[in-house]
Amino acid sequence: MILDSLKNASASFSLNPRFKKAFDYIKNNDLAKMEPGKIVLDGDNLFISLVEIDGKKPEVAKMEAHKKYIDIQIVLVGQEMMGWSAIENCKREIAPYNAENDIIFYTDKPTSYITVNPGEFAIFFTEDGHAPAISNGRIKKAIVKVLI
């Protein structure tokens, strides 16, 4: 898991060849002013889901993980807390892995929390369980899906 500011995004380019294209798009477009929806940058290899959601309380946020995609979660409006736990600590599955949606949910609780503000991002790799959307208010965010 990585937490950083968008102004430092170039430091992550070496981690995946698709990161540069994603962050270049984000830098050159005002995502906060766009309507929610899907932005395809490179087919199923790289796309952005723009969402507006009501925040959840920490006790109801579910841990999730992915096997095929890295998540880059960028807060556009509001403030979001995200839970984190190493995937090996996520043992209690709610349901089997959903390959079509590349997601599995767990009842396990995060071992750590981070706060992400507008202009900041969190990268969750396949070894990172995460509980997103923890907030007292409404959040607008971009979820960049990067095929590994």
Q: What residues fall within each predicted segment?
A:
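A short, N-terminal "cap"/entry segment at the start of jelly-roll beta-barrel domains
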Residues: I2-S49, V60-A65
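A short beta-loop-beta micro-motif enriched in histidine and acidic residues
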Residues: V60-D71, N89-E93, K109-P110
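Glycine- and acidic-residue-biased ligand/ion/polar-headgroup-sensing regions
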Residues: K68-I70, I74-M82, N89-C90, Y97-I103
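Short, surface-exposed beta-strand-loop junctions and turns on beta-sheet-rich folds
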Residues: E88-C90, H130, R138
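Conserved metal-binding segment of the jelly-roll/cupin
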Residues: I114-G129
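A short hydrophobic beta-strand segment most commonly corresponding to one strand
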Residues: F121-I123, R138-I148
